[in-house]
Structure formats: structure tokens, C-alpha cells
Amino acid sequence: MTTHEPLSWSLPAERTSAAAAWHPRRCAIAAATVVVVGTVPMIAHAATDDASNAATRRLIDSQLTDAAAKGPATFASTTVIAGGDDVPASPANTLLVAQQAVPPADSSVKTSPAATAPAAASPMPAVEAAPPAPRPASPSPTVILPPGTPAPDTSAQAPAMPSGPSAQGPGALEPLQVSPEAANAAATHAAGNAPDNAPVGAMPTDRQAFHDEVMRESREGAATLAQENLRQHPDWFKESESWHVDHAAAAQRIRWGRQQLKVINGPERFVIIDQAVAEIEALLKKVPDTPENAEFRQQIVADEVVALASRGRMKDAVKRYEAMSQTGKVPAYTRVAAGDAYAYLDTPDKAADAYARALKDASPGEIETGDVQEGLFYAMLDTGRFEEARALLDKMKADNPEYVRLAPEAGTPNPDYSRIKRLEAQYLILTGRTHQGIAELDKWRHEAPFAASLVSARADGAMVQTEPYRSRDMYKTALAEHPDDLSVVAGYGRASLAVDDLKTAKNVANGLDERFPENGSVRALRKDLDVYQSPQLIIQSTADKGNSAFANNEYGIDTKAYSGPFADHYRLFFHNFAGRAQFDGASESRVRNGAGLQWFDTGVEVNGEVHQSVGAAGKTGGTLDATWIPSDHWKVSGMVTNDDLEVPYKAYQVGVTGKSLSGNVRYTWDETRYASLTYGVSRYTDDNLRQRVAANFYQQVFTSPRHTIGVLFGADTSRNTMTGLNYFSPSRDYSGQATAIWSWTPWRYADKSFTQRVYLTGGMYNQQSFGSSPMVEARLEHVWQINRKTQVSYGIGFGRHRYDGQPENRKFLYLNLNIPL
């Protein structure tokens, strides 16, 4: 008996002694498989789902827009992506174990129909391969089983072959355009494999033994080596067997490519995944679109969806997924990849559906449940399904205690528990309970101070609290700890945009979207930067009807058009105001055209404009206004002009114009509270000097996922040096009022939302010589966030007020547009 005889006893009956003598090759293949499988968990970093970008960004945009009202600036949030400490993996980054079927002992090496082909190594982009098994029978190359689970009986589980149009498979799809990178990768590596296959000795010369060895290599985790060896004698294999080996090799490259994307930052990170995409698309062209091949083609497309999503070709991935969903069964891991693509493309309803179906259909170990649940959580928030998101969190919490159950060592922490606590804190922040959510994040940051996911979540909370400076400082500090974490890098860029530091944001974003096209945080930064750098159109229009104190009928349209920024600090703008009023049987029009230059830098904005008025008192003039935001809490602004648009129409009719100077100081505690003080003085050409002082205080008193209620208190006083004029000019007056503001957002979809607001105002007005009288006003407003670039708001209202002792009922409406072009 030779030393190799015991080995031959464990071989299948059909193996010859010649094939049995090659056990050194088997040992080498097994060793290589163990090395690959063992090192994958060490190099694979986790990633949160990029759908959180949209969820946080929507709330940050609305808060900063209301608070800052700075015109062209656009604000956005960040989220965590691959590369951080303790960061959960993207739902597509599955850690799976693939098994395949082996040809029967009497399999012929002659060409035969594809329907009789054996199943090859799992084409699913898994990161592990199953241990060698003595020819298990698997219903398809994409069946996923956890280690040690026996393969099911194919005779008992094989589904009936579909008939009709569904049997045609995805082959009826129009071919996707192969990217130049993928074509080049396929040409460069057509005869090779990446990573290179280690030499393991000569192959058998016997035809049957050679055939069996290649199929065993394909089955036991060496599919690319099997493909390489098959090319030596392609005529020794059935055409269908070649297809299955090619499929298994392409799937293995997808697995390698997905790992390469995580650990390499240079342009070479796409080499393997591009090769895999090219091979998958070439294989689809080889396999005939026939009913007997429909199931196999469905499996190929399932892996193609994963590869395309990993490469950042999200639209192509969605196109393939939607087509294959109509023709047959879709694996759970493919639905996860499709969910990632939908989330990336800001279609959260479809992302939620894909994630939910993946969780429902997945076999044990097929997908990373926690990551998919996190993606579903953010997709629910992005579609306004807050109650369902809360229920999902409760389920996750029930399934994941703080410590691992039945762990070898008592008290072993459960890594998914910290994820759930972070999501609970983010849920509080994104549904209005910002302080409570931030307190929870600060608590967990104390427990894990270097976790990039917690740093990004906390910085997001600062943005929601209208604290962009603090958010940027957090990201800047985190960069020293996580210089390669894209969520931190992109977050720093977006926070820089929030304080008008365009140069820094551009430097951060430079080249990121080309190097990481699949990354959601990088894409969010690019979208914010594109909006910030685009031209912008802002239109504010009003019309009202009242008594004759100011005008019987009046309307005005104020239009500003800004160019895109140039030299990182400048914009050109054009300004037009057109208005008309009717009173006492007469009418008066006013038009003013101007052009100017805006200069901005971190926390500073200055606008200088030269303008020309036409009409009865037309003149050439200029306006200078400036805003300084030295911190997250203080904002100081001022304006000076020698052609004041606030001069009443009745005064303008008789040739009166005015010069004015005004200033405002505002202190903001957070998104729920602020106070402001305004002073203005105007000198009219009829020698009337008008002064005004106003103070306001706002406090939010109630918040829920869809509703907020706040109260705005105001008091002001004014005085004029001249009275008895043809326009309203009281010697002294005072007013105090309180406005209740109810805001309701019944619809939300990614960047889009609809908000309805009701304003109810009541107060007292006192005019010297005329006494005190009540004043009331009611207003209804709708705000449409049409997309990331466009906001439309409009409203109607009614007010009652006394002027010179005479009551005036005023009806008004308005329309505002903010459209980056």
C-alpha cells in the first residue's frame, strides 16, 4: 500500500488512480481557499447604508433654510460609509457561503443541451467558499447554505420549468453598454486571473481525470483556476459546462472585486470588478435565450446586478433588476444590491420594497440581516413611514440583546446592539427630538470615542441643530483619527459648504466622485457642491387688497438672478423690482433694475449693487448689504441704500424717495429657539425722518415626526418727525403680537416634501392720538420641496388693523420661488 492509498478511499467511485495521485494539488487548492476565506473577515470593513444621507439631509436642509435664509447657499448632511471603525457594512456586502453541485459519475464530456449541465460553483458574490464536499447536489449555482448544512435533495426540490414569456429569462434585455474600463479590463486579463492563481502542479493528462479535476476546482473555491485550466482543452467539456465554469469564475471575481473596492483607494480598485462585469455581460451573450436556459440566465443576471451596483452603475443595476423581477425568482442577495442602488438613486420606496423582500426571502446566512434592516430603516424614514421605522427598531432591539446569547464567554458584547442604539438616537434626531437624540449619541461616543459612525451621526446632529461650525470642527477632528473614512471626508466637505467655505469643499471633493462613484456620501457631497455652484433664480411676489391707508390694491415682484461662483469667492447678480399700486382713483408704478457683485467667504457675505429706478421719482443709486456669522449662535447683518424700496407708493407718487440704514442682530440657541433685534432709520426727501425698532423671540413648543408647533413673539415701535402727510406717517406707534405657527408635513419622498403651515396672529396696536386697538391676522402657506434644487412656497392671508383710527381689512397672497438653474 502506498502512502496515497488512504486518500483514494475518500474519493468518489468514478475517480481513477491517476486522478487520485494528485493530492498535492488538492492540498494546495484547499490551503489557498482557507487563506482567502480566513483573511476576508480581517480586511473587510463595515459600511452603513447610504440611504441615511437622504434622511438626514432633508431635515438639515429645512432647518438651515428657515434659520439662515442666506440665498444661494445650500446645506446638506452626511452619513457614514465604508471604512470606519465599528461601522456596519452596506447591505450589499454580504458574507455568504456558496455551494455547488457536481456532475454525476457517468457524465459525458461530449456536448449536450444546457439543461443537462451540472451546477457550477456558486456565482453569487460571496466572500467565502464552502469546504470540500463529496459531490453535493444543489438546485442551482446560487443556492446559499451555511457551513455544515447538508445540501437539499434536488429531486425533491427542483421547481418546474416555467413556460410562456417568463421562460425567456433576462436574455431578452437589450445589451448594456460596456464601459471602456470594463472592456479594457476584460482584454487585459482575458488569459489571466486576479489575484493570480498559485502554481499547484501539473494537471492530469487523462481526459476524464482532467475533466473531473477542473470541475472539482470550480466546485471547491478555485473557479478562476478551473477556468484557466479549462481553456487548455475546451473541447473536453460540454458547452454548458464551460458556461457554468465561466459563471463561477466571474462570480468569484465579483467577490474579489468587492473586497478590492474596500481596501484600495487608487484607480486600480476597479480592475477586478470591471473584468467581472465584462465577463458576465459576455457570458449572457453566449448562453442562448431559450426556455431550458432561462433559469441559468436568471442566475447570471442576479450576479450582474450585484456587480453593476458595486461598480457604481446604479441605473444599469436597477434596469437589470426590474427586468429579471418579471421573469423569475430573484435571490435575496440580489434584492439587497438592488435596494442599495435604489437608495443611491433617491427612490426610497423601491429601496424599502427590495430590502423588505430580501429579509423575507433570505435563507439562513444568505444576507447580513442587520445591515439590510438598517437600509430598510432609512428608506422608511425617507418615505415618511415613521411608525414602521420605529416598529422595525423595536424588533431589532428585541432580537439583539446587549450581550451575545449562549456565548462561550459570559458578557460578550453584541456588536449589533451598538448599531441599534445609534439608530435609535438618529431616529430621535430625524423626528424632531434632537436634544434627546444627541444626548444618546454623546453617551455612546463616550463608550466608543473612536467609532467613525458615531462621529458622523453626532456631526449630523449638530447640523440639524443649525450648528455648522461645530459640525465642521467635529469632522475636522475626526479626520485626524479616520483620514481614509469617506463619510468623514465627505461630511467635512458638506459642513464647509454650510459656512460658505467653497474652496475647502472643492478641495475635499476633488476627484472623489471619479474614484468612488459607488459611494453614497461622496455622491451627496457632489450633489451639494453642484447645487451650490449652479446659477440661482430667486423670485418673491406679493399682492394685496385693502383700504386706502397704503393702497387699495398693490402688487410687487422682486427677482434676483445669481451667476455661479467664480474664483471661489464671487458671484455676479442681476436684480429687478417691479410694482404697481392703485389708490384714491390714481395709480403708481415703480421699476428698479440693478446689477452687482457678491463676495463671500467663511461666515461672511457682502453684496454691492448699482441700480436705476424709473418712474415719477426715478434715480440712480446703490445698495450695500453684508452678513457676518462669526459662530453657530450669532448672526449680524446690515444694509445701506440711497433708493429705498420701502418708501410708500403715495409718497413715491409725489416724488419722495428715501435713504435708509438698518441693522439686525440675531442669537440662535438651536433649531428650536432664537431671538433678534432690528433697528432701522430712513431719511425721506421731504425731510421726514423715520426710525423703527423691533424685537422678536421664537420658541418651538411641540414636535413630532410630522408636526411642529411654535410661537413667535414680537414687539416694535416707530416714530416720524413729520405728520399730516399724504402717506401714513404716525408721530409714534407701538405694537405687540404673538403668532402661533403650526407646521404639518404629510408627504415626504427622498429630497421631496410637502409642508403646510398655518399662522395665527393676535396683538394690540397703539397709535399716538388714536389710542389702542386689536389686530389679527391668519395665513395659510404651502411649501413644496420639488427636488433638491427647487422650492416653491405660496400662501394666502387675511388681516385686520387700524390706521389713523380707521379699520382696514387686508387680503393678500404671495408666491416665492427658489430655483438653482
Role assignments for model-derived ranges:
Residues 1-47:
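Gram-negative bacterial Sec-dependent N-terminal signal peptides
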Residues 47-203:
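Compositionally biased, proline/threonine/alanine/serine-rich low-complexity intrinsically disordered stretches
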Residues 135, 161-164, 172-821:
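Gram-negative and organellar
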